[in-house]
């Protein structure tokens, strides 16, 4: 039987935003700024280029000279409540799973990317002709949904299981999808990369691919304790053995049918 270790959960207040404000260009930029712990300049400018798909523009990021000289990547790090879901409507496709991250902290790269993209559209510069008809005043912005970013491009990503005082375990995410989808929501870090700027009418968003997921090796559950406080309960006794055997995981078939949403999602690009 798995050993249970109880830990008090200490949470810090997180920025919140209304659904309406997150659907405006100014609102999503301000929200991304509010969850950034730094305002250090990272991006010099962004260029959107036409692609083979009419609704998509490729994204080219020019970092500042100091970062470029250090061969810094354009990856973006996020932290937040993370859950991998099965996509019931697409089990026979490569995007049979997707990641939902309720972001609580983000690299300044995120807000500067949004700021640069919508600045380009406002000033009609560094964008393809297909975007010249857009106005930042009338755009419905969809990068965030319910303060979360959805990522269904997982191919080639790595997952790193970490535990204090122990060596981490690094694996390809392809072999971990099933077990990860059975985990409870957990605080995790994700390294993502922007793929395209997507437009459907006046709805727009930036889509991302996952490069790496960094998550606690322990399988945990948040429960209400006898005192009424939330407690973080470890569900594993031997993390490495349980990880290998997929023990200590939630048994329910936690699936999410994106087609059941009233609003048709546009994060599958």
Curated annotation (Swiss-Prot):
Induction annotation: Expressed in the early phase of the viral replicative cycle.
Biological processes annotated in GO: chromosome condensation
Keyword Hydrolase: no
Entry's Gene Ontology cellular component terms: host cell cytoplasm
Predominant subcellular localization, coarse grouping: host cell
Cell compartment(s), UniProt: Host cytoplasm
Cited function: Plays an essential role in viral DNA replication. Binds to ssDNA with high affinity and localizes to cytoplasmic factories where nascent viral genomes accumulate. May disrupt loops, hairpins and other secondary structures present on ssDNA to reduce and eliminate pausing of viral DNA polymerase at specific sites during elongation.
Family: Belongs to the orthopoxvirus OPG079 family.
Miscellaneous field: This protein is synthesized in the early as well as at the intermediate time of infection.
Protein known as: Protein OPG079
Source species taxonomy: Viruses, Varidnaviria, Bamfordvirae, Nucleocytoviricota, Pokkesviricetes
This protein's encoding gene: OPG079
């Amino acid at each position: 039987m798995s050993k249970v270790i109880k830990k008090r959960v200490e949470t810090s207040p997180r920025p919140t935003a209304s659904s309406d404000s997150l659907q405006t260009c100014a609102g999503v930029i301000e929200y991304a700024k509010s969850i950034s712990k730094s305002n250090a300049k990272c991006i010099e400018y962004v260029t959107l280029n036409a692609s083979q798909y009419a609704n998509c523009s490729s994204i080219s990021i020019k970092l500042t000279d100091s970062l470029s000289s250090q061969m810094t990547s354009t990856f973006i790090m996020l932290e937040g409540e993370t859950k991998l879901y099965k996509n019931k409507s697409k089990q026979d496709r490569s995007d049979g799973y997707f990641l939902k991250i309720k972001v609580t902290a983000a690299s300044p790269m995120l807000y500067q990317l949004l700021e640069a993209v919508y600045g380009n559209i406002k000033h009609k510069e560094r964008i393809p002709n297909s975007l010249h008809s857009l106005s930042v005043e009338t755009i419905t912005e969809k990068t965030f949904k319910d303060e979360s970013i959805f990522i269904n491009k997982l191919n080639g990503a790595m997952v790193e299981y970490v535990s204090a005082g122990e060596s981490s375990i690094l694996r390809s995410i392809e072999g971990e999808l099933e077990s990860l989808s059975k985990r409870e929501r957990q605080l995790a870090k994700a390294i993502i990369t922007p793929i395209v700027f997507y437009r459907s009418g006046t709805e727009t968003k930036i889509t991302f691919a996952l490069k790496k997921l960094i998550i606690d090796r322990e399988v945990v559950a948040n429960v209400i304790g006898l005192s009424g406080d939330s407690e973080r309960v470890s569900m594993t006794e031997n993390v490495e053995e349980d990880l290998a055997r997929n023990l200590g995981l939630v048994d329910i078939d936690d699936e999410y049918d994106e087609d059941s949403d009233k609003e048709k999602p546009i994060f599958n690009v």
